[in-house]
């Protein structure tokens, strides 16, 4: 029973939050309680991994849920992202939005994403994905005073419904050929015929949609922009992490006969995503939209490694980049939420930020430099691993395209940094003085993570490997 401890604890936290909806619990106590829940869930992963071998956890209790090394890594990072999301909720003055119902939905979404990353079966994966998605629709729409939030929720719901139908059709094709919907059976049961390839593409298209890769990204601009800033950060970090987790497990933990065909598709998506994301970012002046479009570029970087995995190249660069990128994005949206609340943020709103909030301004700068790939930052290390994997696999052209797009991204990230340090401040910040200290701690945490991880003093993957036996 202890091997399923993280799964059970996250489910219990969800039920407790639902029961608390009928009480008059304050926002402060609700946030503190949920942070405690997710800290316990975070610790439970290490308890489980320390007490059981990998072979035992791969086959424990159920053929549908597995706490392998990949699930362990993604589960730990997802728990950390939930904690960052909850801490960020402290710094919003919108009491009507941050009601207990919102935290119950957030807990349900966290459970769905966590369970999804543990799943090794197609139908169960979709069920947990829908649990998380339905919660997100409601969380986006809860900001009902904003017309764009209701529009964003409806658009996300409608498009997700279509993609779920495609996923189920693909799962039916896969079952018809492989005779099972378990990942391990799919890997050995599928062949290179037309039905197998179409089935896998339809299944993976759902993940492409949630990740917002090229061809599936148009929704993300409107939905993220129409969402509360904190919810947008949750989508850009936790939801993207869980979607990539399924993609990686399905394609690489259980590699099948069609992996070469899929990797060719991944290479095309990587190139198109990097260029499309940069083109969208270059013309934007809205900070949230820049970050949304830049997320498409970073997904493209991860796809470089996914298209390069082979005998001499591991999936490690993609896992490292995904884990560190989503944590940094979580920190960034949390800091922005603390500084500006839920109002629209133009680049000009960052003018002279260093004069009034030097710690947060420096954190914002370090994050932007990390996204560029500045040396001794975690972004530099991630890009080094990603581009090296492409070269080692013989796909040097992908590394070249990646470097070109990294150079393009310098323009809009430097635009933000220049605005912070070389322009006069004209806009009041929303964070109250009483909340400055906590926000500074959040900013300092992001700086330490980026520098310590990037300089090699601390490695999240090496640390997690200590618990993998």
Swiss-Prot record:
It comes from the Bacteria. It holds the Pfam family Proton_antipo_M. It is found in: Cell inner membrane. Keywords: Cell inner membrane, Cell membrane, Membrane, NAD, Quinone, Translocase, Transmembrane, Transmembrane helix, Transport, Ubiquinone. It is a multi-pass membrane protein. Disulfide bonds: none annotated. PANTHER family: NADH DEHYDROGENASE. This is NADH-quinone oxidoreductase subunit N. The gene is nuoN.
